[in-house]
Amino acid sequence: MIVWGGVTNGLVSPYVNTGGRYSPFRNAWTAHLTNAPLVGRADHTAVWTGSEMIVWGGVSSTLPAYPAYHNSGARFSPATDSWLSLPAYLSPTARAYHTAIWTGTEMVVWGGYNGSALNTGGRFNPSSGWSGVPVNNAPTARYNHTAVWDGSKMIVWGGTSDGTNGITRGARFLPRTGDWTATAWLGPVILPDRINYCAVWTGTEMLIWGGKKYSYGGNTSYRNDTFGYAPQRITYLYTRP
């Protein structure tokens, strides 16, 4: 497991650009990743390519009222213990609270926030650089959502566009054609909106668990339910206890 970036409890420069590597086999940490060519940040994304970790985006600030959003990134190779900066040319707009997935050949970044919610993104291929993600038929702008890769499509769901109201819709993106398709469901189960939850792809379905429903006006309710989304079963949503 490779960990990088985040926020500490320190009052001076709380955003860090260091990390570490954890070996479950040896139950030990090694290599503190202190030579990253990136400023400290949080709420960025990281994907694993099979040989490298790619870090992109995020936010940092010396004052909460003046956040600095980033559109920079870098690739870390554990084999050589070295970093390589991502090209800036054609990279997406700076953002944080976005999602990123690895398709097997490229990283797809989508959504996020940089003062307002976004419904744009980008695709990074280590061999050829950045290219865009179409906005035609793209889902509603959002952040604090989730995205998974099902082997051929990126599935996006949930999040919020204003920090108050959750979104209960999503979409599937097919990189091969550049097409977006809205998700839908059948049956009596309606998936409650939420943010700050987790989602994984099992090989056959997207599982969504936890999160919270937040309102600036008052109440915050936390979720402990699980929902599954299976595209191959005519997009049927169900719940598990």
For the regions a language model picked out, list residue spans one by one.
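Kelch-like beta-propeller repeat domains
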Residues: 1-241
